[in-house]
From Swiss-Prot:
GO molecular function, one term: triacylglycerol lipase activity
GO CC terms: extracellular region
Primary gene name: lip
SUPFAM superfamilies per record: alpha/beta-Hydrolases
Any one Pfam family match given in the protein's UniProt record, by short name: Abhydrolase_1
Species assigned in the record: Pseudomonas sp. (strain KWI-56)
Top-level EC class: hydrolase
Coarse class of the protein's main subcellular location: secreted
Subcellular location field: Secreted
The protein, known as: Triacylglycerol lipase
The protein's assembly and partners: Monomer.
GO biological process: lipid catabolic process
Length: 364
């Protein structure tokens, strides 16, 4: 009976990951050059978001540039930035993979950065990463600091995720390891099918381990950044860093829609501050709203404090923290699902547009 219950919990966790999966395709130099020319021809005169260097949007776990080549991961965001004068590209990396190593997302992103630079003639890029995409962006900033002007992370688990710890612990109840293998195979196939390029470089177990709190601590040792606060603290670090003579501007923000409430018999309740209780349409039209409320409640009962359903406030702190008060869950941060969000949630498209202007005014 207990094993059956644990299996259901694991299945639920996987289903949750599928329901909240955000979407990204590596583009050839010729295609990028054509796109760059088209954007330059249509950029508005005022150039509110016209940064000096190109912006690359970097997706997180389970992502791609467009799910199945149709639904944008950064829903409506690339188009809005382009309409306001920005030169914007969207990376397409493995949806399920670690960030370091030869097959990792970091090396994939580095190759894409070089492709964008070759297509545009720029010398640097501004990296904007959501969720795991922030860790991937930090990798590139660490190993190729001369190619990066700024790193912005949105809802990134710099200290890992308590929900990843929870899933790993549940899987560990199976002494045979069969559950992990079967579920990982299923998730890997999901990653291949939803990738716009049907990328076969998928490793769900490596991705899960990357996002645990223990592995995040190791990652931070291997790829340190001045933007990180002291280990174990709920503090951010410096707003800039200089690596090999190259200065990077560092920014972050996050949603904290899931807030702890009262504790009864050792169990802490939670509330979703982004929605109107019972009547909010987001609960009906966006299945990820309730799913992330559930995962966020699990996190709170594992000591995370306020969170977005997958990443805690403390874990998301990095560089100059612009806000941790947005009433967003993890998908609201990228305007998912399909632009539906709770009645109290701010507009993420406007927030990212404003940040592009901030980068412009900072000279990058």
């Amino acid at each position: 009976m207990a094993r059956t219950m644990r299996s259901r919990v694991v299945a639920g966790a996987v289903a949750c990951a599928m329901s909240i999966a955000p979407f990204a395709g590596t583009t050839a130099v010729m295609t990028l050059a054509t796109t760059h020319a088209a954007m330059a021809a249509t950029a508005p005169a005022d150039g509110y978001a016209a940064t000096r260097y190109p912006i690359i949007l970097v997706h997180g776990l389970s992502g791609t540039d467009k799910y199945a080549g149709v639904v944008e991961y950064w829903y409506g965001i690339q188009e809005d930035l382009q309409q306001n004068g920005a030169t914007v590209y969207v990376a397409n990396l493995s949806g399920f993979q670690s960030d370091d190593g030869a097959n990792g997302r970091g090396e994939q992103l580095l190759a894409y950065v070089k492709t964008v630079l070759a297509a545009t003639g720029a010398t640097k890029v501004n990296l904007v990463g959501h969720s795991q995409g922030g860790l991937t962006s930090r990798y590139v900033a660490a190993v190729a600091p001369d190619l990066v002007a700024s790193v912005t992370t949105i809802g990134t688990p710099h200290r890992g995720s308590e929900f990843a710890d929870f899933v790993q612990n549940v899987l560990a109840y199976d002494p045979t390891g069969l559950s992990s293998s079967v579920i990982a195979a299923f998730v890997n196939v999901f990653g291949i099918l939803t990738s716009s390029s049907h990328n076969t470089n998928q490793d769900a177990l490596a991705a899960l381990q990357t996002l645990t709190t223990a592995r995040a601590a190791t990652y931070n040792q291997n790829y340190p950044s001045a933007g990180l606060g002291a280990p174990g603290s709920c503090q951010t670090g410096a707003p800039t860093e200089t690596v090999g003579g190259n200065t990077h501007l560092l920014y972050s923000w996050a949603g904290t829609a899931i807030q702890p409430t009262l504790s009864v018999f050792g169990i802490t309740g939670a509330t979703d501050t982004s929605t109107v209780p019972l009547v909010d349409l987001a609960n009906v039209l966006d299945p990820s709203t309730l799913a992330l409320f559930g995962t966020g409640t699990v996190m709170i009962n594992r000591g995370s404090g306020q969170n977005d359903g997958l990443v805690s406030k403390c874990s998301a702190l990095y560089g100059k923290v612009l806000s941790t008060s947005y009433k967003w869950n993890h998908l609201d941060e990228i305007n998912q699902l399909l632009g539906v969000r709770g009645a109290y949630a701010e507009d993420p498209v406007a927030v990212i547009r404003t940040h592009a202007n901030r980068l412009k005014l900072a000279g990058v």
